[in-house]
Amino acid sequence: MEGAPLGPLALRLLLFVALPASGWLTTGAPEPPPLSGAPQDGIRINVTTLKDDGDISKQQVVLNITYESGQVYVNDLPVNSGVTRISCQTLIVKNENLENLEEKEYFGIVSVRILVHEWPMTSGSSLQLIVIQEEVVEIDGKQVQQKDVTEIDILVKNWGVLRHSNYTLPLEESMLHSISRDSDILFTLPNLSKKESVSSLQTTSQYLIRNVETTVDEDVLPGKLPETPLRAEPPSSYKVMCQWMEKFRKDLCRFWSSVFPVFFQFLNIMVVGITGAAVVITILKVLFPVSEYKGILQLDKVDVIPVTAINLYPDGPEKTAENLEDKTCI
């Protein structure tokens, strides 16, 4: 898939954060306290399906998206960061007659892609903007088409919600559309309440540490083959190591995000200092040139006085030896 343009999204994120911040600065009021209750957004997603006779049927898929204690839930199913594909039972509103707008509500099994992305607003701060997008893939085993995406933006700090709002944008311009479906995290367990033990959940890309021996059998729909039952595996050192490495990766990313600005500032100071010193030295050489070349050692002229050797034995060394022999004989 081709990448969607990020210009409108970046502008919305900037306005989403700048508008409340500017209000706090101008009024001089302190930062508003977090909302007491967890935000709960029941959104309706407009989709179209193709009937057996070739007619187009318009339907609405109702999803209940909540945020509580740093965790995003979709129909009480915990969803982590990234793109997760879940299959769950939810309410579907079907328009039987478009002229009279007669609606028929029923519960069906839907397959939906959920994007959860966390945007750190400032380095070293717990202020984050959580972006949630959703795309319905199937309803009761039938392919559907979706044109618009409802984006939910939640501004949180220390797991407390400061503000949340909804936007509607075309599917082609969303981040979810630009991410390939091959990288989705599959979540095929039935709808479990978030009040139950989350440790019994098992996905195809992440495993929680809890010894659970159970299998989940899927209710086979008409015209659909059953999937292989999932069995929770006992904990192993490999899974624990994967969790440690994931935590280490997040800590390392947080560390580099705080170190990089300081490193680049230091590098900027070094480059500016070396360049400035070279310019100053060049200017000084031009203004005050050196007349003498100091590379050659210059010596003062010294008068050389010849030294004459004085011979203490003018008769030669042979006569001196004879005189010594005569004195010895005497």
From Swiss-Prot:
The keyword Transmembrane applies. Residues 24-268 are extracellular. Glycans are attached at N46, N64, N166, N191. It is a single-pass type I membrane protein. Its main location: membrane. Residues 290-330 are cytoplasmic. InterPro entries: GINM1. GO terms for cellular component: membrane. Residues 1-23 form the signal peptide. The chain crosses the membrane at residues 269-289. It comes from the Eukaryota. Coiled coil: none annotated. Keywords: Glycoprotein, Membrane, Signal, Transmembrane, Transmembrane helix. It is found in: Membrane. The keyword Transmembrane applies. Disulfide bonds: none annotated. This is Glycoprotein integral membrane protein 1. It comes from Pongo abelii. The gene is GINM1.
